[in-house]
């Protein structure tokens, strides 16, 4: 058996499999990528033990825990842990602080003939390590912010750069009012943990300059960490440009064709299309006040007609109508205003090929 470990850096850099022995309610609030929740106690059992601890102390709480998790319940849980240990011989287990729960799991596994290491300090210590990692990256590394009108393909650029940090990808959201995906977003703590691990791995690969997309503080329901967002407000910018026609086609691809396919993959043909249509109309409704009543109604009618035609024949051509209107009358004026206020920070502007070449050259020079 490997020794119990407090080398959190190695655990995250190597994507070491980990078993989380906390209760499901704790796990749902935040965990680490790829970790499996195999709790010692379920939520109700944990609550009872916690109440007992407050009223009668630790010894009574431990005794109650053993009474609640015994017999067949205990056997089923131990068997699940054994299966995990056999499937992941290089893995570790942890609880919240690396205390009684993970020690109990470790001891019961040993009683069953399985030696398995635990993470010293548990979830809390690993979470603190990742928050420190995030702080150090923001403090010590340089950042370049990639801006551009809606539909210029900023994410396409980021995916081609080894030093990019894709905040929208980590948040599973495209960042705009239309940015929700067919699958949900991570919890805030999960978002922060994934971001910190991404930064940790890139720095371990020698990357000290990062390219991030120009985002508001909120990417859907995920908050960009305050110190990172504040740092982004003063960083140099690169502005991505493309023709209006290309941008319309890209938005059609991303927000209609691909999003519809996502919903159908997740929910099936009939329900998937209905949920896709509902999501698109709701996204437009979210900016009703900013569009104004007349413009919202006009774009909504165009969108509804396009959705009906798509459902009837599979054709998506009519969607270009509302996309062109939304870009020309809403997003483009808004982004033009933002660019004017950020002009002093923009050190380069160009199309995808030019911007990629510039950012790659810039990363090699710094």
Curated annotation (Swiss-Prot):
Task: Spell out the catalytic residues.
Answer: 95
Q: Name one GO biological process term.
A: tRNA wobble uridine modification
Q: Sorted alphabetically, which SMART domains does this protein's record hold?
A: RHOD
* EC number from the UniProt entry: 2.9.1.3
Segments forming domain Rhodanese: 12-135
Keyword Transcription regulation: yes or no?
A: no
Extract the signal peptide range.
none
Instruction: Name any one GO molecular function.
Output: tRNA 2-selenouridine synthase activity
The record's catalysed reaction(s) read: 5-methylaminomethyl-2-thiouridine(34) in tRNA + selenophosphate + (2E)-geranyl diphosphate + H2O + H(+) = 5-methylaminomethyl-2-selenouridine(34) in tRNA + (2E)-thiogeraniol + phosphate + diphosphate; 5-methylaminomethyl-2-thiouridine(34) in tRNA + (2E)-geranyl diphosphate = 5-methylaminomethyl-S-(2E)-geranyl-thiouridine(34) in tRNA + diphosphate; 5-methylaminomethyl-S-(2E)-geranyl-thiouridine(34) in tRNA + selenophosphate + H(+) = 5-methylaminomethyl-2-(Se-phospho)selenouridine(34) in tRNA + (2E)-thiogeraniol; 5-methylaminomethyl-2-(Se-phospho)selenouridine(34) in tRNA + H2O = 5-methylaminomethyl-2-selenouridine(34) in tRNA + phosphate
Does the record's keyword annotation contain Transferase?
yes
Annotated InterPro entries: Rhodanese-like_dom (IPR001763), Rhodanese-like_dom_sf (IPR036873), SelU (IPR017582)
Task: Cite the entry's keywords alphabetically.
Answer: Selenium, Transferase
Reported function: Involved in the post-transcriptional modification of the uridine at the wobble position (U34) of tRNA(Lys), tRNA(Glu) and tRNA(Gln). Catalyzes the conversion of 2-thiouridine (S2U-RNA) to 2-selenouridine (Se2U-RNA). Acts in a two-step process involving geranylation of 2-thiouridine (S2U) to S-geranyl-2-thiouridine (geS2U) and subsequent selenation of the latter derivative to 2-selenouridine (Se2U) in the tRNA chain.
Against HAMAP family, the record matches this protein to: tRNA_sel_U_synth
Q: How does it associate, per the subunit comment? A: Monomer.
Family from the record: Belongs to the SelU family.
Supply the PANTHER family for this chain: TRNA 2-SELENOURIDINE SYNTHASE (PTHR30401:SF0)
Q: What is this protein called?
A: tRNA 2-selenouridine synthase
Question: What gene makes this protein?
Answer: selU
């Amino acid at each position: 058996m490997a020794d119990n470990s407090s080398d959190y850096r190695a655990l995250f850099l190597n994507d070491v499999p980990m078993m989380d022995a906390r209760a499901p309610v704790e796990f749902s609030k935040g965990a680490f990528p790829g970790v499996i929740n195999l709790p010692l106690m379920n939520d109700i059992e944990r609550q009872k033990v916690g109440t007992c601890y407050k009223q009668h102390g630790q010894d009574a709480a431990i005794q109650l825990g053993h009474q609640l998790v015994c017999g067949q319940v205990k056997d089923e849980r131990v068997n699940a842990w054994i299966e995990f240990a056999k499937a992941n011989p290089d893995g570790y287990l942890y609880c919240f602080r690396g205390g009684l729960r993970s020690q109990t799991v470790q001891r019961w596994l040993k009683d069953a003939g399985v030696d398995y290491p635990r993470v010293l300090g548990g979830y809390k210590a690993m979470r603190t390590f990742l928050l420190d990692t995030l702080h150090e990256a923001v403090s010590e590394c340089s950042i370049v912010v990639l801006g551009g009108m809606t539909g210029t393909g900023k994410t396409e650029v980021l995916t081609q750069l080894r030093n990019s940090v894709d905040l929208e990808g980590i948040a599973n959201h495209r960042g705009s009012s239309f940015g929700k995906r067919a699958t949900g977003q991570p919890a805030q703590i999960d978002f922060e943990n994934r971001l910190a691990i991404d930064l940790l791995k890139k720095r371990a690969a020698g990357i000290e300059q990062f390219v991030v997309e120009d985002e508001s503080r909120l990417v859907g329901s995920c908050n960009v960490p305050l110190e990172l967002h504040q740092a982004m407000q003063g960083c140099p910018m690169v502005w991505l440009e493309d023709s209006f026609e290309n941008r319309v086609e890209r938005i059609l691809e991303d927000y209609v064709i691909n999003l519809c396919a996502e919903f159908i993959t997740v929910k099936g043909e009939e329900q998937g299309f209905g949920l896709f249509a509902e999501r698109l109309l709701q996204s437009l409704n979210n900016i009703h006040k900013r569009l104004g009543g007349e413009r919202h109604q006009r774009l909504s009618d165009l969108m509804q007609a396009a959705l009906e035609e798509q459902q009837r024949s599979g054709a998506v051509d009519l969607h270009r109508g509302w996309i062109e209107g939304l870009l020309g009358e809403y997003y483009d004026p808004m982004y033009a205003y933002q660019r004017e206020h950020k002009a002093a920070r923009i050190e380069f502007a160009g199309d995808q090929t030019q911007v990629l070449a510039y950012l790659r050259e810039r990363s090699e020079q710094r």
